[in-house]
Amino acid sequence: MQRKKLISKTPTTAVMLALYIGVAQPSITSAQEYTDQITGANDAYAAHGIRTTVGMESTYTFAEGDVVKWTNAYPAVEVWDEGTHLKFTTPLNLQLDVKDGATSGIHAATSNYDTPGRLTAQNVNITGQSTGSNYDINRIYISGIDTYAADIKIENLNIDITADGKPKSIADGIFMGRDFDDEDSEHTLTVTGAANIKAVSKNGYYAWAAGIEAQDQAKMNFGKLTIATEAMAENLARTNGIFAAGNSEINAGETHINVKGISPNPDESSYSYGLNAIHSSTITLGDNSTIHAESSGDGAVMTVGVRTGYHSEVNLGITNIRAENNSAEGTVDVLFVEDGSVLNMAGGSITGANNANNRTFNAINAYGEDPDPTWHTDTIVNINQGTTNDVVIVGDVRAANIAIVNLNLNTDASSITGNLDQSGPYVDKDDSAGTINLTLANKATWHAMGEYGIGYSYLEKLTLNDGSITMTNEEVQNIDINHLQGTGGELTLEADVNLNTGFFRVNNADTDAAAVHTSYAGINADNVKDAAGLEGLVRNSLKIHDDSAAKFDVQVNEGLLIGQMQADTINHIDGNAIANVKIAQSTTVDAISHMQNATALSWRQEDATLSKRLGDLRQGDGDQGFWVRLNRGEFKYDNAKNQNNFFQMGYDKAGGDWHYGAAISRNSGKTTYGTATAKNRSLALTLYGTWLGDKGHYADIVLKEGRLSNDYDISAPIGFTHGQYKTWGSSISAEYGREIAMGDKAYFTPQAQLSWLRIAGKDYTTANGIAISQDSQSSTIGRLGFELGSRLGDNGNVYAKASVLHDFGGSADTRLSYNGVSTTYSNDLGDTWYEAGIGFNLKAKDNSYLYADVSKAFGGDYKTPWQWNVGMRWTF
């Protein structure tokens, strides 16, 4: 045995024993580096590092840190022929560095398939490279494990190898196959614990890299598995994460695969497969797995996340799969299932990446085999069947030549983005269509989009149980469904401003009474305009079989001027009709109407009674008076609320039984209504004459003219509107009453008042271009009421008051137009309400008087939750 010291800062005490046929070898007391044959097991084969042959059972125990560094073109470790068993009880570290040839870390083979050789090891680490060129064997080759008809058991495995050379550069992390002269042979490789495999092939005219390659009835079992491969070729590059052929079987738990193929030659190709099962093989992966496949180059690049073909089967737990390429000439199939194969996937994601405007981009591509009944089996893709796992699919789904795709999306986090086509890209006169069955349930969504290549959807059966479909894309999309089942869900179709849209068609009279709520994206009610426009839109977009029990209602979101449209539909395969049409007032128009009402109501609220304006005029001693008052309050009308501050001051002079006066006033208020706000202001001049007759009679006549302004902002789903305008307000009021004494102090004053108010019309345009023309609005208000009070000698009085008021109304039309769309609304403030309050008049000094009251209006559409008024009058 020859050995060389491994350079180490801290030598370790260890023992290496080679036990073969019961004979022990000498102890080694420090970590060793082995560069030649390790003798003892089978010294006749010096080209191998360690080799066993027929009938031998050998056990190797290496010291910690021992490494076998191998530069020979033969395997570093070989199990050869029948009945052999090679055991490693401590970590096995192999470092390969071979020039101009082919090599393997571990090679196992036999000439008798009934009793294959065996290898048992733990913590196996294989690293290295094969470089240079060899045109005699036409390749540079390296494999971590290369086995034919052997039984291998390893606990924890790490492989990191590179093939770098010409003409062909080939790297297999694990290759397992057999000789072809025994059709019944089986062989198994089992790795417990974790297996980490990296294989890189580069610089050859042809490059092949595979993490695992299984041929000819090979069987492999793994726990947690991680694979990374990369093939970089001057011409043709091929890479596989796992490749299984010839009735092979591979099982793994949680698995993570990352593969990449690169070929810069525009006349050559690059092929990348995450999983590739063909020729009656089976691959099974556990939950929480990931597969990422990527290709790049200037030629015809193909990327496949998972392929299963020729009567093979792939079973995936919850797995996230992504396939992408970076070539303008490239194609992507995240899942590619063909020729009588089956793919079952419990859940996860199936996504493709369109990095360079790929010609085709398929999340699922299923193509069946010849339907000849003598040997045909179905090609089937099953996603989330019988489970409730999240599923996310990005890319088109195709089924051709009687292939079957079953998609079950039944969680609110599940979605598919792409088109579904069961005619398939290969269908011609010699082919048949496939079958796609889709279930959308529990808020799962389908975004039908044509940007990945197809441009329409055609499927056999849609089961809709509280799922949603969105047909939104710049390109018009069509969906054809043979059978619609389930309880129903949501459908959104995109249309352009000319009401061009794709269609949703159900071709058969299914008995399920699916209730489908249909809405339209890309347009609003302003585009549709009226019921006739809605009828045309529905006929073009919904084509439901006449005898279908499904029920479709439609909705168009509101525009600026036209409100939300709703209707039921009547099924007809050539285009549904509509019934029970409802067109609401838009948020914007409704808010403009309420802002206009706020102006009118604020003007009406300024109309005051005599006592509110002047207090008790009879208490004054002089023939002239100056007065001021402040009023603050809040009113509500039809869910609009206004808070305002009103200030007024005036002067009057007595002439016989009359007091003639004038006043100026300023009102400032803020109105809120939903998402709309407004500032209401007025500046007014008032002229009045008040008659104080004998026996408590009085009359009060008031004329007022004011400048009114309204500045409003409206936030609506369709957008923001700002408007402002100014107009004139006029009013005339006449009040009559009589104070009737009820003893020394008490009194009762019945009152009647009639007012006429007018707000002039106005034309203006909002900031976003809505042209508005308001008619003038007039209103007549009658009031009947009383005061019941008590005098405080010569110092004033206190009182309670109550009234009933009625606005006789008077409608005013407002016309609005925007981008060729117009609408009209009418405002009529007719109403009956009640007012009640308390107040006082108090002589402050010989020639000054304080008066105040609080009141509340209730019982009608118009309400004032609170209002107070306070004033001061000086006489001289």
Predicted regions and their residues:
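Outer membrane beta-barrel transmembrane domains
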Residues: 686-691, 773-876
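Solvent-exposed, glycine/polar-rich loop segments of beta-barrel outer-membrane systems
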Residues: 591-594, 643, 670, 674-676, ...
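Extracellular beta-strand/loop-rich repeat segments of large surface/secreted proteins
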Residues: 365-382, 388-542
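Outer membrane beta-barrel translocator domains of Type V secretion systems
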Residues: 585-748, 854-855, 860
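Outer-envelope beta-barrel architecture signal
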Residues: 414, 622-626, 645, 656-660, ...
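Outer-membrane translocation/initiation segment of Type V secreted surface proteins
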Residues: 32-33, 487-507, 514-652
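Extracellular beta-strand/beta-solenoid scaffold signature
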Residues: 39-53, 69-81, 95-117, 127-149, ...
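Gram-negative bacterial Sec-dependent N-terminal signal peptides
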Residues: 1-31
